[in-house]
Amino acid sequence: MIIYLHGFDSSSPGNHEKVMQLKFIDEDVRFVNYSTLHPRHDMQFLLNEVHKLVSESKDPAPLICGVGLGGYWSERIGFLCGIKQAIFNPNLFPYENMTGKIDRPEEYKDIETKCVENFREKNKGKCLVFLSKEDGILDSQRSAALLSPFYEIVWDDVETHKFKKISHHLQRIKAFKQR
């Protein structure tokens, strides 16, 4: 089973495209929709939904996958639920760049301070990170500097922030999920 979390633009047709691409490596792909506007509520909702999906699944190695803001949540929720994560251009600093787009971006900072201490150290090797060399929205070098001590980073020369086409990374995701 692969659980897919969308980014800030939940209505983008690219979400459906990514779900369809993921079905090439696992026919059981679940799309979890969340508000994106209320971080504390989103965290509780996502934690409950993902925990329920993982509990009901017969897959011995489920994976959570997300793009942008969905990558932010996938890393954290995947860690808390004990499943591997594949994240594309994760928005690691939403409290800096979501001002004016959501009601309380400062809640992300609060979530960060209340999260398990050194969670990335405890999650080491359980997350596969895909970063665009030309993201266009986020600073990929900053993300790589933060994440590379803990996770494998895969650089993409073609895609931009929304990572419209993930098909050329599917076999790597499949191998990561299975190991």
From Swiss-Prot:
Gene3D superfamilies: alpha/beta hydrolase (3.40.50.1820). InterPro entries: AB_hydrolase_fold (IPR029058), UPF0227 (IPR022987), UPF0227/Esterase_YqiA (IPR008886). Disulfide bonds: none annotated. It comes from the Bacteria. NCBIfam families: PRK04940.1 (NF003431). Belongs to the UPF0227 family. This is UPF0227 protein PM0825.
